[in-house]
Amino acid sequence: MNKSTSSLDYIEKLPLPAEQAEVLREKLPQAAWNDQAVLHQALSEGSPSEEHQVNVQSEDDATLQSVQARLEMAWAEGLDNGKQLGTDREGRTALKAMPVITRASMFPDVWRTNPLVRWWESLLGRTVPPRPHYSPEEKISENRWRLVGTIRRYILLVLTLFQTAIATWYMKTILPYQGWALIDPFEMAGQPWTRSLMQLLPYVLQSGILVLFAVLFCWVSAGFWTALMGFLQLLIGRDKYSISSTTVGNEPLNPEHRTALIMPICNEDVERVFAGLRATYESVEATGNLEHFDIYVLSDSNDPDICVAEQKAWMELCRDVGGTGRIFYRRRRRRVKRKSGNIDDFCRRWGNQYSYMVILDADSVMSGECLTSLVRLMEANPNAGIIQSSPKASGMDTLYARCQQFATRVYGPLFTAGLHFWQLGESHYWGHNAIIRVKPFIEHCALAPLPGEGSFAGAILSHDFVEAALMRRAGWGVWIAYDLPGSYEELPPNLLDELKRDRRWCHGNLMNFRLFLVKGMHPVHRAVFLTGVMSYLSAPLWFMFLMLSTALQVVHTLMEPQYFLQPRQLFPVWPQWRPELAIALFSTTLVLLFLPKLLSVILVWAKGAKEYGGALRVFISLLLEMLFSVLLAPVRMLFHTVFVVSAFLGWSVQWNSPQRDDDATPWSEAFVRHGSQLILGLVWAIGMAWLDLRFLWWLAPIVFSLILSPFVSVYSSRASLGLGCKRAKLLMIPEEFNPPRELVATDEYCRLNHQRRLDNGFMQAVFDPSINALASAMATARHRFSQAIEDVREKNVRDALNRKPEEVSNNQRLVLLSDPVTISRLHYHVWQKPETYAAWVESYQKLPAPHIKS
């Protein structure tokens, strides 16, 4: 970049054919070769933007005049003949990235979690009456399935408690110390405390073991009966109460009911996000129902490089598919309440323009048939507030992800169908790949922060369960369309990435349990809050169970048994060991844990195993996945225990992973994360081997899994092993045998997007003419003229230019990007005075040129 010919260098950066670039050079007088103001005036001549003169405050704002011209050079096809362009009140070019706002009121009710306060308010007549919305016919239909659901859930409760009671009784007979009834606390009060401790300690440990066993077995039993009923449901193939059976699947969509596909994102893989979005858009277009749908990308990204990359990817998507005016993009400057706040902001601004909205995750892909089916289900079921599809996991290559894909694809349908069997229209909502009726969502599903202070107060983290509970509290159904195909997602590529996600989910589920006693919640959703907590609380309970069992073994081995527990006891109380009962109970527990997996494979065999690699390979894959789950279960147990304890103590668990180019876990990170588990496993194994080698065999699956945890974590994160399994047709899923066109398109567009990806987005927005024009046109801080604002702008620009680029913080970069004036002034200064800002120029010249033309 030469000071004396900066304008000529600038023209070289414009995406112009050689002939047009030459015409522009000849148009400039030689005296203006180093004058950016003259150049941008020349660029803007003849542009329609001349009708709206930019309110230029100084020569520094010269680049604002040519924003429209530069946009038309780079993305003319995506501007819909200029219809996508507009101006703000100061005449500055602005892209119409979002439709006109039509505001709706959305405010939350205050949480009343204290039942005594609610009782007192009801005495004072302050209760809020229910808000009915059903016709008499609809009420009859709902009462029918609600009665069936209630009966089914009572059956589940009886089965679970009965099974738990029998297992707990067996466990009681297995434990060695059986003299609890002979202990007399009054007698113990008169003897030395050490003797009392020696007598009581084994029985206290046994009591703790028994209580924990009952809780954990009940949890396992509930999962077993859920999977069993799902197996029967899928095997029969008929479900009278399936919501999918309420339409024939080819009804025309009501043109009065429009649907918004909204994708909240935050610092995601930009190339993958927009590849999946394009595949989904084109699939909807192929159904012939595109006019019923709009797409919204709602960004909460706070990485300036990613923000600029998102803007470029959005513009390219609109250009490639002709989606101008139908695909919208918004980046929030004030990130309130995370994902739920992002969705709430959409509902307040544009929600009342739509009857339904489909929530997509950043990795979601949905077929047009699935989306139109969800809309038809909403129209056929006017009492439904949320209909959740059952997303299938696919698209990953690491060994860890392939094991998880296989598990969710083979076992997942049983549990999902089982959940539907027990819950019917009072079901789960998982926060994505689901359709929501917008009006009741706006009226009833705004989330107030949890009252109080501490780690369990403030904005709700896991919003999906709470929104489903509020929707049901308002009288609307929440359904799972478990048999609806065409819904896809991706899983974390390795164990550590999954655990990062689990840390957030753990905290969110623990917070949600504060709503267990909130007024009006349906009992099923209270149970959902409980199961959400148990998903993570079961880990510390299991760990405590193992610790107490180990402590009991230590006491049994090292302490002399107390045979006489009363002063005049005639016969001693002998510790006993009944191995036949222990083996029977252990076998029963294994059956509850692994029979659902075997039933899943039987179901695959019954319906055809070809898409899973064949009958034999499915069985081998089952054994591999079972081995893998056994190795990972103790590792997850310890991590989840740390997450739960940290949440209760208010500790902030920092998890900063090193940057890596692929999904593989480096050895250094593996030993940092799993080192304490390895040491615990070694100490535990050595201690038990010294104490009683027989007990070590019972603990072997636990301790050896901990010892091997770093190695399992590293090797399972490698794509080479996963691809080797794929070549051997192991851990196969139908989406690999016969890939849906949406997933094939996603992979294709992902490769295309990687070829034209934008790295170092902020620097490109400062220097590159096309990217700068895009950033300026999409900047949202569009203030009217004010001297105070001008002073702040000047200070921000000056502070940035007086530093090296790497010294400008992300927050400062975001402020500069958000204002069309500041980002344009940066662009002007670095091109007008390259020798003054040599540090910026040198940093930019090291970067590859951005890909503008497809």
Curated annotation (Swiss-Prot):
Highest taxon of source: Bacteria
A Gene Ontology cellular-component term: plasma membrane
EC number(s) per entry: 2.4.1.-
A Gene Ontology BP annotation from the UniProt entry: glucan biosynthetic process
Molecular function, one GO term: hexosyltransferase activity
KW Signal (keyword) present: no
Pfam families membership: Glycos_transf_2
Localisation per UniProt entry: Cell inner membrane
Membrane topology: Multi-pass membrane protein
InterPro entries xrefs: Glucans_biosynth_gluTrFase_H, Glyco_trans_2-like, Glycosyltr_2/OpgH_subfam, Nucleotide-diphossugar_trans
Gene: mdoH
UniProt-listed Gene3D superfamilies: Spore Coat Polysaccharide Biosynthesis Protein SpsA, Chain A
Pathway(s) per entry: Glycan metabolism; osmoregulated periplasmic glucan (OPG) biosynthesis
SUPFAM superfamilies (UniProt xref): Nucleotide-diphospho-sugar transferases
CDD domains from the UniProt entry: Glucan_BSP_MdoH (cd04191)
Keyword Cell inner membrane found: yes
Keywords: Cell inner membrane, Cell membrane, Glycosyltransferase, Membrane, Transferase, Transmembrane, Transmembrane helix
Name of the protein described by the UniProt record: Glucans biosynthesis glucosyltransferase H
TM regions (residue ranges): 155-175, 209-229, 528-548, 583-603, 619-639, 671-691, 695-715
Family from the record: Belongs to the glycosyltransferase 2 family. OpgH subfamily.
UniProt function note: Involved in the biosynthesis of osmoregulated periplasmic glucans (OPGs).
